[in-house]
Amino acid sequence: MNLTLPIELKAKLDKELGNEVEYLVPLSDLSYWKIGGLAQCVVSPNSLKSLQKALKITSEFSELPRLIIGDCSNLLFDDEGYNGILIKLGNGLNELRFENDEVYCEAGVWVPELAFHCFRRGLAGIEHICGIPGRIGGLVFMNGGSQRRGILENVVSVDVITEKGEMKNIEASNIEHSYRVSPFQGKPLVIAAVRLKLERSTRAIVRKRMHEILASRRKKFPRKLPNCGSVFLSNPKMYDVIGPPGFAIEKVGLKGKRRGNAQISELHANFIVNLGGAKSVDV
């Protein structure tokens, strides 16, 4: 793939964001699945102000695809790459601030780190996220969590940025959500930060819950081979009828099934692992 971005766009990005911009980036280096071709452009903002700039600049070139990403722990990239702009929210947006029983997190805060800091303060309520690799912005976007819970159960408010780079605050009363569904999906809004409500507890109690969750994940989930976690959504209605997706997949004899160098994990059938050199078409 050759660089095909409009000259005017590249000039603006280089001038306004400098070393926060990379070109022709191997997506296999970003994805937990270790799969993907080249991305035309990856912008990694080091502040909310830079994020606003990036969104404003790229919105002027609406003909180009644009995607907001985090740690890419839940994404499958095409072998052909991404012929557009990726805006990657990570360590540059990692402000974490505790205020009594609430915590303010910028979108790039790493989820396990947030859980750890809550434990250190004896704050409970979000232990279920402790083993999820990813950024809090992505977790809020998909109302992610574990043990059939979602992070938006604890939301106080969410700061979002519009396509034009304007910051807005949305209170919990205006955030309808359900299992793995949030109002941010399918809307031209970028999650910039979130404020969460926690509960006073003790470090011992929080530690015990986290250890139980992590021990369960280590026992059940494949960790040695590249993967992107659970592939199929556990639909609450179907769960009552056929059980979790992994059980259903195993029941029809697909556990261990291989295509190319991608395989339905022999440890947990709701995981697809990269045995080495797998392609997106294999997955």
Please give the residue ranges for each predicted region.
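Anion-binding (especially nucleotide phosphate/pyrophosphate-binding) glycine-rich loop
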Residues: 2-136
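Conserved active-site and cofactor/substrate-binding residues in soluble primary-metabolism enzymes
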Residues: 4, 8, 28, 46-49, ...
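Short clusters of hydrophobic/aromatic residues that line enzyme substrate/ligand-binding pockets
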Residues: 21, 27, 33, 93-96, ...
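Phosphate/pyrophosphate- and phosphate-bearing ligand-binding catalytic cores of soluble enzymes
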Residues: 23, 161-162, 167-283
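Short capping/connector residues at structural and topological boundaries
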Residues: 32-40, 80-82, 87, 137, ...
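Structural signature of FAD isoalloxazine-binding scaffolds in flavoprotein oxidoreductases
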Residues: 36, 43-48, 76-94, 141-172, ...
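Contiguous, small/hydrophobic- and glycine-enriched helical/loop subdomains that border
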Residues: 98-102, 106, 111-112, 124-131, ...
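A gly/ser-rich beta-alpha-beta helix-loop segment of oxidoreductase catalytic cores
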Residues: 119-121, 125-156, 227, 233
